[in-house]
Every structure is written in C-alpha cells, then in structure tokens.
UniProtKB/Swiss-Prot annotation:
Its main location: cytoplasm. It comes from Pseudomonas entomophila (strain L48). NCBIfam families: homoserO_Ac_trn, PRK00175.1. The keyword Transcription regulation does not apply. Residues 51-360 form the AB hydrolase-1 domain. The lineage of its organism: Bacteria, Pseudomonadati, Pseudomonadota, Gammaproteobacteria, Pseudomonadales. GO terms for cellular component: cytoplasm. Transfers a succinyl group from succinyl-CoA to L-homoserine, forming succinyl-L-homoserine. Substrate binds at residues 227, 357. This is Homoserine O-succinyltransferase. GO terms for biological process: homoserine metabolic process; methionine biosynthetic process.
Amino acid sequence: MSTVLPEDSVGLVTPQIARFDEPLALACGRSLAAYELIYETYGELNASASNAVLICHALSGHHHAAGYHAATDRKPGWWDSCIGPGKPIDTNRFFVVSLNNLGGCNGSTGPSSVNPATGKPYGADFPVLTVEDWVHSQARLADRLGIQTWAAIVGGSLGGMQALQWTITYPDRVRHCVDIASAPKLSAQNIAFNEVARQAILTDPEFHGGSFQDQGVTPKRGLMLARMVGHITYLSDDSMGEKFGRELKSDKLNYDFHSVEFQVESYLRYQGEEFSGRFDANTYLLMTKALDYYDPAAAHGGDLAATLAHVTADYCIMSFTTDWRFSPARSREIVDALMAARKNVCYLDIDSPYGHDAFLIPTPRYMQGFANYMNRIVI
C-alpha cells in the first residue's frame, strides 16, 4: 500500500502490554498466578475518563482493530471501517481500547505462552476460559488504565456476548452496550458446528494432545478444516452464490477427488490455509468452548429478563437479515428480555446479503445506524 495513510485512519499504532501479578480466579476452578494482556488505544482519554470505549473481539479477532503498525502494512486493523475520525466509533470523541483476550494467540497470555511452572508452552494445560473470565480480566485492564466506567462497550458475535456480560457483571461500570450480531446463548446447531471444528483439530495426528509445540509441529490440517467449516457459517447462501455460483477454476471437470475444481472450493481452501498459518489450535478450542458455555440466564432458570433486572446500561442491539449463525431472532431474544426488564434498548435489523460477516462490512445503513447511536452518547 501507499505510505500515505488515509485521512480517516487512526494512523500508526503501537501495541502495549499490561502485566498482572495478582492471581485471577477462573470459572473452571483454577487460577492464573500472573498473565499479560496486549492492547491498543486510539484517541485521547479525557480528563474525567468519561469517553472510554472498549472493543471486544470475536473468535478469531485480536487487539489490532484499527490503524496500521507500519505505513507499509497491506491492510489496517480488522474493524478499521468502524474506528477512527468521523467513523461510527469516532476517535475525535472517544478513547478506544482494544485488547487480545486472555487465552488468545496474538500477544496475550494463552496456550502458546510459556508456563512459568514448567518452562514449556502451556498447550492443552492452559485453563478452560469463559466469557465471564474475560470480563474480569478486562475489568482489571480498565483499572490499570484509570477507567472506572466505560462510555460504551462494543462487540460483534462473541464480542457482543462479552459486552452483554459486562453489563451483568459490572452494571455500574458500563453506560452503553452495543451488541452486534450476537446471541444470549448458542443454539444446539451452533454448538454442533463448534464440535465438528474441534474434532477436526483434536483428531489431527499433529495435535499431540495439545502439546504440538513440544513436537515442533502444527495441526495445520485440523485447523484448516475447522476454519473451512466455520467460514461457511459466516456467509449467507446468497452471498456465496453471488460470489462463486458454480464457477469452475478451469473450463472443465477433472472427474477425480483431489483436484480443486470449483471456485468456492479454492476460496475455502485458501481461507483455511491462511488461518492455519496464523492461529493457535489450542486457542481455537478455548474460544469455541467459551462460546458454548455462555448462558447468563442459566443462573435464573433460563429467565433472561430476570438476569438483566439489575443492569443500568442503555443498549443498542443490531442484527443482519441473512445472518443464520446468529439470526435476528436471537438478537430479538435479548431485546425482548430487556424490554420485559423495562430497560432502555434500541434495535436495528439491517438488510444485508453478507450473513454473519456483515458486522465486519461497512454497508451504508449499518454505518449510519451505528454512528447515530454512538453520536448520542454523552461524554
């Protein structure tokens, strides 16, 4: 890319690392004696620390949400379309914090980190995590940054679950929750997709029970298959049909089982191979389990309205018409529960052909609705 950065970019950014030496008790019954969180910030924190916005990432996300690490970077952060001057999360107004969650593989302590007790990577011995664990670790980061109350917490997909959980766990520390393309818990179908993906990894001979780093190998085939399965669920049938149809890679069929014949096959293999070269298999297992386990209403007999009775935040819930992974009906479950609990909520169902991935794609109505809500937040 050009060395001249776009005017609406947050510009060049440098990741920072916060180290915590206080033990963090986890839902699984174990604890981490010490850990690190990598994060980035965009914009300036005001004198009263009232303009802070937390970005919570989805399954394969990370801390680099906006801007560039170098002027020669080919692409900006994963949500650059939404974060920056004049964008929905306007860095002329807000101080934005984006982190890589605990258990991740982009700089925060996770399975690929060295376990100080053994001198080897944690691997499969890294504790199983929950959305609630992430929220507690994020609260410690907020304390470290001098942020008592977030102006808003924003997330899509798994990130939306974290945003919702913040309002439940720390109701006095969140003024606005923007929950996009999410759900209050996974359906049986979603859990099933995650299990297929996990089995692809667990049965890869190179997985070695999660200790593949000790063996100097990577379960790339399992990760590739997991990503291919997941990626299908992120797209709509219409968008796949429009993009690929039944187009062939060449002008004829090969009548074998090994050739890549259809364009959609080539695309999925590319996505899987690219992902398997940058993501950690144990982190993938952790992230999908955190998704499966999330069910905040379980503590109230499945009554989500009762679960949300004590929250104080205002909510913006957004869904996308062709998202079948987290359908609009799942977002409306949250909206209905908030209304039953007599909370302030606005809901926008956006017509988009892009399926679950629509929360990453800056279509006009999405950007307008997102910006309209963020602009009304008083800082």
